[in-house]
């Protein structure tokens, strides 16, 4: 068995355990597990680099992403078009280093392992999708018009 096949089998096992543990808890606990605040925005797109900002609950995270791999637009496109029961991984590159992502959707919930949360977290998919779209639109508006958007962080 080749290395890629083994990695996929391990990922499938891991996600099976994660989704089973989510399914096994009571509805109240599921609501608690998906109750996070989340935001995303593009801070800048420069020559060869994209700068993005994430907030999960009270933790803020900034990334500089190289154009040598998938970028912010790929994250937005993939995040907002994830089908039910679909899982995907991708990597953002920095020099040096990389940021690995895992997105797994089941029905109306998404499980995310991000560079800032290796243990993963759950969100209601529509909430996540709306925050990603909003961050993309505000970021583009800010960069190309220099307009301050109401409610935007300083």
Where are these regions (language model features)?
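Short Lys/Arg-rich cationic patches that frequently serve as NLS/NoLS or arginine-rich RNA/DNA-binding motifs
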Residues: 1-22, 26
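Long protein-protein interaction modules used by eukaryotic assembly/scaffold proteins
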Residues: 2-3, 14, 30-47, 53-56, ...
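Alpha-helical interaction segments
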Residues: 8-12, 65, 91, 126
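N-terminal low-complexity, intrinsically disordered segments
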Residues: 19-77, 86
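Compact, well-ordered interaction domains used in eukaryotic information-processing assemblies
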Residues: 67-110
């Amino acid at each position: 068995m080749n290395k890629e096949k083994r990695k996929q089998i391990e990922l499938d096992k891991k996600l099976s355990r994660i989704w089973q543990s989510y399914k096994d808890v009571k509805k109240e606990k599921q609501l608690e597990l998906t109750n996070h605040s989340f935001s995303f925005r593009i801070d800048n797109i420069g020559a060869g680099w994209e700068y993005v900002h994430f907030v999960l609950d009270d933790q803020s995270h900034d990334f500089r992403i190289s154009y040598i791999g998938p970028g912010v637009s790929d994250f937005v496109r993939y995040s907002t078009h994830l089908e039910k029961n679909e899982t995907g991984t991708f990597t953002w590159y920095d020099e040096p280093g990389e940021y690995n992502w895992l997105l797994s959707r089941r029905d109306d919930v998404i499980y995310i392992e991000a560079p800032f949360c290796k243990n993963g977290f759950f969100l209601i998919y529509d909430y996540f999708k709306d925050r990603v779209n909003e961050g993309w639109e505000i970021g583009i508006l800010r960069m190309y018009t220099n307009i301050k958007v109401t409610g935007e962080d300083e």
